[in-house]
């Protein structure tokens, strides 16, 4: 893929690495739905694992960038905005339409974004001035 910048390559690798445990977790959801407490705890745990992994991986790329979770106020200046499991309700009910989403904000504008659905292995990404693409 010649259209990938080195920065986008790092972001894609970080998101895919953070997503790696989600396929196993997703396959367990249906089995756990009969036990409401353990099921809810499991979903919260899966979300937390992805959140921590994203913070670790994105911190390696740009250690000076704060990380905001989608729906919370963004810090001033440049930052990553993440949705560790976008479509959490779908994930929680065993519906494979969920994703990990990451946006890069610089100078008040989105300069790069990734949406990755680990259940279908579909990845969409965009970078300012370079276009938007679907991997594969």
Q: Residues of each region from the PLM?
A:
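N-terminal subdomain of lithium-sensitive/metallo-dependent phosphomonoesterases centered on the IMPase/IPPase/PAP
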Residues: 1-85
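DPxDG-like acidic metal-binding loop motif
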Residues: 74-133
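Anionic-ligand binding region
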Residues: 136
